[in-house]
Amino acid sequence: MKEVVSTSNAPAAIGPYSQAIKANGFLFLSGQCPFDPRTGAIVGANAVEQATQVLNNMQAILEDQGLGFGDVVKVTCFIKNMGDFG
């Protein structure tokens, strides 16, 4: 059984998807953007600041479900400029 997960502590989905789906004891988070959940504005002028906001958004969704980063098994990261990697 699948359950849609949504919290006001993370940005609302901007398309036809959910913040996360809970299924069979797993939580699958959708891709996250560096948006402020209150204003919808992009946070951060550089990759570090934007990545920090993305992690904050992920943490809000995880915590809403009683989870934390220690429960994360896999992350896929898309980086526009590989010079920002590392």
What are these model-predicted stretches?
Residues 1-86:
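Short, polar/acidic, helix-capping and beta-turn segments at strand->helix junctions
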